[in-house]
Every structure is written in structure tokens, then in C-alpha cells.
């Protein structure tokens, strides 16, 4: 990566050997020291003009000590990958194209830290990122170029949206100066995906890129999880900007339940003779399988699940009635007709489950 390095400190600066020869390359090294220790920024010089100014460097090592912080000047593609590393990303899925070539150049340089899974088609890449998120509990990341590459992601993004899967889709686009001019392979992918994303961005300034990526990951994982799209014009991926590493923001806790609501639920559970518990995909996404098992045992309830909720409760348990709804089991249909209390956990009540609202769980509270 070609970057400029700036080391900031309110403490004493002691340059040591500003330039020295190392083989056929020059090594730049500055040390900054105080009572807390020494911070050293070391870099290869890849280009120096005749006046020895305005050079760019290849980072070898930066050691940060207490009292110091280091700001690197990276291009947009490198900032993007550094932000992915901040979020704990080590695997991305995608298919290359003209508008994301700078990102793929950076991926090659970061190949020891981030694994790229190449698919035959962008739609496959998006579904793979979605599946990766489901199986790993992490945020899926997919990369596609502008135009047809971006539109090929739509089905995968919509799937993640409907199933509440955390996904960050990164698309390239034409340079900022060509946006809105019907340029080659330009589409309004932000507008196209607006109905099937939690949020989306068009990053027109490289200085906004890092915080945009961080916010995208936060939104994808906060509350009801889902996909977020970041559209990055090609020139933004090449422009240089200062970058400072930041720790991910902690995800805010969910909705606070009022005491009177808890008391109402307890009263209903105590009164119930034939409780029925219906589990959905939220049980799996929140890793609440053990809590659900404990709850069911204490209530002595029978259990059914949605399609997304399968695996949230042990299907070999005698309390498990199978799936509920249009494609569910006869056992679950009979049990819900007979129950006197219906408890839904981590689910939405889709038309495939409710069918006819007037006859759904007719004897239940």
C-alpha cells in the first residue's frame, strides 16, 4: 500500500536516523519518546522527489505506546479493508469488476489477513455471505462492481433482509463526477435496494469512508439485524486520506421491558394449563436456545417452530411438535387448537403460519 505516515504526540519528538540505506531501498524511522516509553514509526520509502518532499511510504511496522497515536494516510480501498479488520472481518465474498479493481488490488495486499472467496456470479457471492453469517454468527461481507454486478446482489440482499441476517454489501460505482449522467454501468443501487436494506450509503468523499463503514456494521447488528449497502465511487477508492484505527462501538442493548408487562406475562403463565411456545429465527440469532429450553421446561409447554426457527429447540425432545403453519405438522395444528396460552419467542407471524387469523389458536390468551 502507498501511504503517508504522520505520528502525533504532545510529547517530545526525537528524530533518529531520518534516512538510512537498507539494501537498495531507504528506510525512514522516527522515534517519539517520553516517560511512558517509545513509539516508533518505521517505513520503506517507495518514492521521493528531487526536493525530498511529498514522499509516500510502505508501512513495515508501527509500535504504539501509551501517550501516542498514529495516523496513516491510505487510499480509500485500504481504508475500507482496515475498517473491515477493525470489525473482526477475515472473510469476504465477491466477484471483481472495473469499479472495484482498486479494492481487489488492496485485497491482494491484505491477503494474509482477509480471505476472499471468489464465486461464479455476484448473486452466488451474496447468498454465500448470507450463509456465512447464518452459520458463523458474524457479519457477512460481499463485494460487487457497478451496474449489473450491483443489481445481481439484490436477491441475496432481500433474503438477508427478510430473514434478519447481518450483511454488509459493498458496491463500486462510476467516479463521483459521472454520477447521475447515465454513465457506463451506472445504476442507482442505493435507490434500488432501499426497500430491502436497513440503511444504505453513497460515499462521495474518502474522508467519510471509515466512519461510514463503522456505522454500517453497527446498524447491521443493532436491534433486528439485517443488510446494509455501501456504494463507493471508483475515485473514492483511490483517493488518499488520513486513517486512524478505532475500536468497534458496543451494540446497544435491546428494548427494555417494563415491570408491569413482566408481571402480566407471569400471571398468564401461572394460569395456563396447556401452554404452547412458538419459536422463530430470533432464538437462533440471539443464541437463546438454552434459555428457551429452560423456559419451556419450567412452563411444561409444548413447542413448535417456524421455518427460520428450526434448530432453536431440540427436535428430538418429546415436547417438540414440529413446524407450525401451512407447511407444518398435523401435531402442531392440533396442539395450537387445544392450547390455552400461546407464547411467541423471536418470531414474526407471517401469513404462512397464521393462515386465517380468526381461527388461529381460538382458545388461547
Report the location of each language-model feature.
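Residues marking helix boundaries in flexible regions
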Residues: 20, 60-63, 69, 267
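Intrinsically disordered, low-complexity regions of eukaryotic proteins
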Residues: 15, 42, 53-55, 66, ...
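N-terminal alpha/beta PP-like core and its mobile active-site loop of ThDP/TPP-dependent enzymes
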Residues: 69-365
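N-terminal amphipathic/hydrophobic targeting modules at extreme N-termini
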Residues: 7-8, 14-20, 26, 32, ...
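N-terminal low-complexity/intrinsically disordered extensions
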Residues: 24, 28, 64, 68-72
